[in-house]
Amino acid sequence: MSVIPSPRPVSTLEPDNDFRDIHNWTELLHLFNQTFTDCHIEFNENTKHVVLFVFYLAIFVVGLVENVLVICVNCRRSGRVGMLNLYILNMAIADLGIILSLPVWMLEVMLEYTWLWGSFSCRFIHYFYLVNMYSSIFFLTCLSIDRYVTLTNTSPSWQRHQHRIRRAVCAGVWVLSAIIPLPEVVHIQLLDGSEPMCLFLAPFETYSAWALAVALSATILGFLLPFLLIAVFNILTACRLRRQRQTESRRHCLLMWAYIVVFAICWLPYQVTMLLLTLHGTHIFLHCHLVNLLYFFYEIIDCFSMLHCVANPILYNFLSPSFRGRLLSLVVRYLPKEQARAAGGRASSSSSTQHSIIITKEGSLPLQRISTPTPSETFRRPLRLQTPHLHSAIL
């Protein structure tokens, strides 16, 4: 998962002849171990491995359940409202892909980073993880942009072509996410020996340049640019909703800020650590104690970044009353009849009180629609306009 090679002592490894042809092995070992020769700090590696395993396991179990539920519920949705959830559905698929790769990292940690699954899986697993990582980030970015466009754009052209545009954007995101990791993956190799390791190993003569290029591209494309777009469009959306003075505008504005903060918390520590370790020794010189500390906590920080697979389903799905109602309706279908009647009554009661946002003409306030109006209220029920609404795109 990392472009930073492990600095652990690897002197027991004996590379084969093919590997010696592209690397100066003595200098490469010195590169891996140079941070340990100047000042060595004793860390409890066993404790770190236990913490990593428990952390990976918790993210795997919770993330698997959450994203499977999100996919099941959103796959059953159709029509205009369902199209607004297209980014959420694809983001859940990408997050699920990351979750499914976690058992491999868990075993690698317990085996002290010994790779036992061959050369092909060494590259494929990393590629699979990176494709889904970029896809998840890009779909989150597209969702933030689409939410604002949906709120502000009432042109007939957008109304006619929005579904086609969203499908094209989703396809483009998957293609782009499949291309971006290639420069990194082609240099991921299995280091054969008594304890095989799967590492990023560009030719030694150009190693620093390759590592810096990969790290910078990951930082710019995987964090800086998406974070800028997510922050700008969520702030614009929050300001727009606040001006409409609707009942739940405060809640929606808080959600906009939560989207920004959670993204930064998940990815900023990882990106900063990776960039510092990549730049160290060639462009900047950090204190050796700090370098040892960063290397020790790098895997923990990397694991921490995967919390977005747990946070995304909560922020973009489970906080939505409509999603919870549809989830309960889906569960009711598989319950025995007696329990289904009781649960169905609760679902009906819940759905009758939830509200959805209907975007009206420019300058007017959003109307509230009650799902099950009484007969006396039917004549006052607002007409559904052709402009898109933000139900569950915001909630």
Curated annotation (Swiss-Prot):
GO cellular component: plasma membrane
Cysteine pairs bridged by disulfides in the record: C122-C198
Gene designation per UniProt: Gpr182
GO function terms (MF aspect): G protein-coupled receptor activity
Keywords, ordered alphabetically: Cell membrane, Disulfide bond, G-protein coupled receptor, Glycoprotein, Membrane, Phosphoprotein, Receptor, Transducer, Transmembrane, Transmembrane helix
Protein name: G-protein coupled receptor 182
Topology class, membrane: Multi-pass membrane protein
Localization in the cell: Cell membrane
Residue ranges, Extracellular side: 1-53, 110-123, 190-213, 277-295
